[in-house]
Each structure stands twice: as C-alpha cells, then as structure tokens.
Amino acid sequence: MHDIIVIGGGPAGLTAALYALRAGKSVLVIEKSTFGGQITWSPKVENFPGIPSVSGAELGDKFTAQALDQGAELELDEVTSVELDGDIKRVKTDFGGRVVMTVTSWEMLPR
C-alpha cells in the first residue's frame, strides 16, 4: 500500500509525486499512456525557466527519471474507478493508498 496514489503521469502528476516524496510519503503514479504527458509530443519546448530549448520527449524523460530517482513507483495502467470512502482509498487497479490525487489533462489538446 502507498501513502499517496497520483493518477496522471504528466508534468503536474510527476511534480505532485516529487513534493509528496520530499515530505517522506510513499508514492505510486499511475499513467494510462505516456509518462511525461502530452509535452512529450512537442518537438521543441522553450518555456520552462532555467531550461534552454529541449524536445518534449527529452523533458518528459527528465521528469520521469527524477521521479524514479526520488523513489516514486510508476505504473502504466488505466484507472476506471476510484473508491474514496473510508480511510483507505482504492483504485480499480487494486493499488491502495491513504490519498488519491487526480491530475489529468484533455484527451488531446489543440495544437
């Protein structure tokens, strides 16, 4: 069982995982598609402070590597339901945790 389950492995989800890990929590991040999120599809990203021009794929890889380096567990799976009643929260993938964070984006953002 994990202290926190983050649903969504894009920039927001991986950032949430990093903050939880820094607070000493055990974290599982569940992503149904691509860790790093939609940014991984961008050929060039130039709007992150302190990071010069980088491909979205490279940036997504850096986000993912940092979460793993800090101790996050990453799982590729699709969450179809969440049970929020009681002290232990459950997702349909059978992982349990005390907190569930949902950080999702649009299915496909317009370009």
Regions found by a protein language model. Give the residues of each.
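FAD-binding core/adjacent interface of flavoenzyme oxidoreductases
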Residues: 1-7, 22-23, 74-111
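Glycine-rich FAD pyrophosphate-binding loop
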Residues: 5, 22-41
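Glycine-rich Rossmann-fold phosphate-binding loop(s) that bind the pyrophosphate
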Residues: 8-12
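Flexible, glycine-rich phosphate/dinucleotide-binding loops
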Residues: 13, 36, 54
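Gly/Ala-rich phosphate-binding loop of Rossmann-like dinucleotide-binding domains
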Residues: 17, 21
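Amphipathic, positively biased hydrophobic alpha-helical segments used for protein targeting
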Residues: 23-27, 31, 47-48, 61, ...
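Surface-exposed, flexible loop/turn segments at secondary-structure boundaries
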Residues: 35, 47, 111
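N-terminal Rossmann-like dinucleotide/flavin-binding domain of flavoprotein oxidoreductases
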Residues: 40-98
